[in-house]
Structure formats: C-alpha cells, structure tokens
C-alpha cells in the first residue's frame, strides 16, 4: 500500500486594486493618465515602483493611510519616486469621491512636498466633480541668459522666437520646472524636442522638466511639458507646473487681478491628442505669492488588480 500524500496548501499573495484615471478632463482617453491605489498601506516602496512601471502612467499615487480627514500618499513615475504630482492628486480626489470615501469634508494629504488641502466641488446633479488642491509653497529662481539659447535649441527653436515680455525662469509649487515663453502658441505644435539634451539641461538646472508656454488670451496659456529626466518624455497635462506658471506670472504682475487674486486657464495635451484644461487661482500681496490652488475634473477609465 502506498502512503497517502498530505493535502497541499496553496498560498497566494494579496492582490492590489488600482484605478486608471484621466485627469484634467471629463473624457476618458484625454487629459493626463494617472494610476490611483487607495489601499497601499501594506506595499513596500519597491512594490509601488514596480506597480507604477506596470501601469506606465506618467505618475501613480499610492494612499498608505486615510482616516479622520488626513491621508498619507506617495507618488511614483515609471522610473522613480517624486515629491508631488498635481494631476495624480486630482485623479485621487475623483476616485475617492466616486468610491464614496470623500463627500467634500475637509481633507489634507501628507506628501513629501508638504501637506496639501483638497476641496471638492460637485455639479448641481452630483455627477461630475471638480477637485481643487492647495499647492505647496511657491518658489522661483532666475535662469541666466546664457541658458536661453540652449533651452530653445533643445526644443528645436531659435531663441529669437522666445517671448521677451514674459518670464523665463525656474519655478515650483512642489516640483521645479524651467518655464520657456514662446511668441505664439502655433510654435508649440512644431517643437522638435531633443529629449537627451532636455534631460541633461534639466539635471544641470536642478529641475524636473522644461515647460514651453505661450499666451492665447489675457489669462489663458497653451503649453507643453517635457520631463525625460524622470522617465516622462512629454507630460500631457501637468497640474503642479501649471500652478507654478500662473504663480510666476502673477508674481511678476503679468496677470489681471481682482482684489488680491488672479486666475487663469492652461490648455495642454493637444499635441499628443489628449487635450486637458487646468484651472489655477493665485492669491498675491504685491509681488508675493501667498497661495496657489489648482483645479480640474477627472474621469475613471478602468479598474484592475495587480497580482504583485
């Protein structure tokens, strides 16, 4: 008689649910893609990085804690962790609202860039929502004229096409970018970015991205944002940089004020076929930026499970 084989035990690792979201748009497939993971408290940083690479969204946000109006989050590109991401934060707000885990009560997120208060605005029917986020503190620094030609040429342009009446500078509301003003929005469509050179210039200037922008109205701008240094050849619609741009313009008196507030719109993503729209409000005292808020809509595209 043969011996009876003991019953086998099978162990499976817990699977992680995620959502893929289009931010700064109400149309799936447009705007800027973000991954959202609501229950990431048991994931290691290495697992978060692998999941972000798996999703291949420009950024993925992971919620490691959420209770009593306070959340703790981390942001990853497909190649590395970053301090903050605007469009992923808008996407997170949408997912929380759709899941019934946020109904507009006070909510703050702890990020590597500081605490970010969120505000939820529902439409009259309660279907669509707009997520507003307070940006981290605004900062700016000069970019010497010696860099102007190199930056323009890295985008395939002559420096004669730079707008001399708008600021060319580095600025941040969470992530540093260098902002390059162009004479006309039509120039954005014809950019020929040299991505290795842009990455090199970004490293030398201590920024995450090179952001080209042009006016299309008194307080409206079109833009493209290149971030190959952090694994994003072109970011479709960039909330953090959009906030920094409008804050930079307001600090230099280039936006109309109502009292001590300026507002504006940024259109981005058209060159990639994924248009989106960013709303920005800036509070200023003289030339000092006291607060920046960025808002937008988002649409959940799909949900899935990552087996790890």
UniProtKB/Swiss-Prot annotation:
Gene Ontology CC: one annotated term: cytoplasm
Presence of keyword Chaperone: no
UniProt keyword list: Isomerase
EC nos: 5.1.-.-
Biological process terms in GO annotation: biosynthetic process
Active site positions: 59
Gene Ontology molecular function: isomerase activity
Pfam families xref list: PhzC-PhzF (PF02567)
Superkingdom as given in the UniProt entry: Bacteria
InterPro entries: Phenazine_PhzF-like
Family the UniProt entry places it in: Belongs to the PhzF family.
Protein name: Uncharacterized isomerase DR_1330
